[in-house]
Amino acid sequence: VPPGFTPFR
């Protein structure tokens, strides 16, 4: 995954 990307918030 790209830095700073999160599938969970």
From Swiss-Prot:
Record's GO cellular component terms: extracellular region
Compartments where located: Secreted
SS bond list: none
GO molecular function: toxin activity
Keyword DNA damage: no
Tissue expression as described in the entry: Expressed by the skin glands.
Chief localisation class: secreted
One annotated GO biological process: defense response
Keywords noted in UniProt: Amphibian defense peptide, Bradykinin receptor impairing toxin, G-protein coupled receptor impairing toxin, Secreted, Toxin
Annotated family: Belongs to the bradykinin-related peptide family.
The protein's name in its UniProt record: [Val1,Thr6]-bradykinin
Native source species: Physalaemus nattereri
